[in-house]
Structure formats: structure tokens, C-alpha cells
Amino acid sequence: MSKIQVNNIEALNNAMDLALERDQNVVLYGQDAGFEGGVFRATKGLQQKYGSERVWDCPIAENSMAGIGVGAAIGGLKPIVEIQFSGFSFPAMFQIFVHAARIRNRSRGVYTAPLVVRMPMGGGIKALEHHSETLEAIYAQIAGLKTVMPSNPYDTKGLFLAAIESPDPVIFFEPKKLYRAFRQEIPSDYYTVPIGEANLISEGSELTIVSYGPTMFDLINLVYSGELKDKGIELIDLRTISPWDKQTVFNSVKKTGRLLVVTEAVKSFTTSAEIITSVTEELFTYLKKAPQRVTGFDIVVPLARGEKYQFEINARVIDAVNQLLK
């Protein structure tokens, strides 16, 4: 199998190219997603290759984009809907939550809505309001949706192609700060990464760290070559937020007895709370110390230069690890 060296944005482009090539029912659209190739150039060259009937531009109307996707999916197509930033998805939530997520149940299985909604998320570009949101917990709690967030090129391509194959809607979050952060060798051919399976990044016996998406790059560097090296840390990349891989996390916590959850999202009512609650409910007697979390703060994302205070977590992670290992 041939290999290619790509960053996350190139892996995503390659995945969409393969999906469009393999299945004539796959269509792609969004604001600037056609001729311009997307604001981050994720769809670069795809309209030129597949034509404007399969790859096209939309006006700034996210509710309409999502509604068109639901109808097209019910009608037999496989739409890829690009919402330019996750913070722009609020108008689309009605169509996604009320129709896309419920159509299988509403029709008693007669209809499904196999669409993929792509959303660049999180910090990294020091932009204005609504450009740096972390909304995965909102989508993850909606029954009928799958919510994924890759952190590297291999998983970006594999999870996206798995999302294309899903008979139900998938919310595909893309960490902007990782789009061009590094390159990785991945297969050039078609492959999938199973939705709902976490990735065990490093094995250890002292502490379990669970994370996903934009924080994984820094955590891997800390564990393999930084201040957290040789501390016995087991690092888990969830990859899928919903349904999340409880078994992998539980098996690790049973071994280490300590848990730290790290996310870029705010602290309250989010995935970090769900993971810690589940572990505490089911594995209380295995815990040597109370689980901790390092997250963003419960505030509106700061603008421009203030962004780093919300999203830079390395020092706080090191402090939390030292506290848990005392």
C-alpha cells in the first residue's frame, strides 16, 4: 500500500476526494466550499474535479445548509455539509437536532439521514467572536448523532471515511490549530477508523490521561519528550466523543487508579464532567485519588490576544499530574 505525507487539512481533502470518487451519491457544499476550496482550503480542487453539481457554494444560511442536507440524505444522497466555523452552527441546530438526529426513530427505521456535518472548531487563529467555539458536548448529548474529533492525519482521514459510511448523521469536528501543525505518513488508499473506538497513545501504570482533539498534540509531546516523560502515564485519545469508548478508559483507570481529563472546552456540563462522573459511578473503589480535569474556563472565548489564556493548558496539566502522583 502506497503512503503519503500529509497534514490534517490535506488528509481531510484526500478523504473527501476518495469519497466523491467512490460514490456518485456523495455531494459537498458550504460557504466558499466550492470555487474557493473552503476558508481553510480543505475542499481545494474538488469542485474543479467533480463539477458544480456535486460540489457547490452556499450563501451564509447555516439553517438552510443543514435542512438541505437532511432532505438530500433522506432522499438517497450522502451530503457533506461544511459549516465554516462551529460557532456558526447555532442556526443549524434545529435542523440537525429535530430532524437529522430523529428521522430514523420518527420513521421507525424506514428513513435515515446519512450526512456528515464538518465543523472547524476551537482556538488557534485568534479570530473574532463565534470563530473559536468548543461545542462538542452540546452535540454529543443528542441521541441519534455521532460526534467525532480526530487529532492527527491518520485518524482524520479514517474517521471521515467511516463517517461517510455511517447510515446516521455524524458531526465531524476539526481542530483548527492542528490543521497544519504537523505531517504524518498515512495510506493513500481508502481505509476507515472505527467510530466509537479510542486510541491508546502510550501505556503506563500510574495515571490515566484522557483527551481528544486540539489538546492531544501538546499532551503527546509532554508525555514522550517533555515534563511528563517517564511518569508512568497512560494517554488515551478518545477520537469519538459520542458514543465514547468507556471500556478503554475504564480498563486504564482500573490499572492506574488515577484519572485526569484534559479538554479545550469549558469546564461545566461538558465531556470532562461526563467522563469523570461515569468513572466515579462505576469504578469508585478502584480510585486512589479523586479524578481531576484541566479545561478551558467557563467564559465566552476571549478575542484575539486573550485566546491563549483560555486554551494554553500545558502548565496546568503538569501541575495536575504532580498533584495526582503525590
Swiss-Prot record:
Chain sites annotated for binding thiamine diphosphate: 62
InterPro entries (alphabetical): THDP-binding, Transketo_C/PFOR_II, Transketolase-like_Pyr-bd, Transketolase_C
Pfam family, one: Transketolase_C
EC number, UniProt record: 1.2.4.1
UniProt keyword annotation of Oxidoreductase present: yes
Stretches of the chain forming a coiled coil according to its record: none
GO molecular function: glycosylation-dependent protein binding; pyruvate dehydrogenase (acetyl-transferring) activity
GO biological process, alphabetically ordered: branched-chain amino acid catabolic process; response to nutrient
Keyword terms: Oxidoreductase, Pyruvate, Thiamine pyrophosphate
Protein function: The pyruvate dehydrogenase complex catalyzes the overall conversion of pyruvate to acetyl-CoA and CO(2). It contains multiple copies of three enzymatic components: pyruvate dehydrogenase (E1), dihydrolipoamide acetyltransferase (E2) and lipoamide dehydrogenase (E3).
Subunit and interaction comment: Heterodimer of an alpha and a beta chain.
Protein name per the record: Pyruvate dehydrogenase E1 component subunit beta
Native organism: Mycoplasma genitalium (strain ATCC 33530 / DSM 19775 / NCTC 10195 / G37) (Mycoplasmoides genitalium)
UniProt lineage: Bacteria, Bacillati, Mycoplasmatota, Mycoplasmoidales, Mycoplasmoidaceae
This protein's encoding gene: pdhB
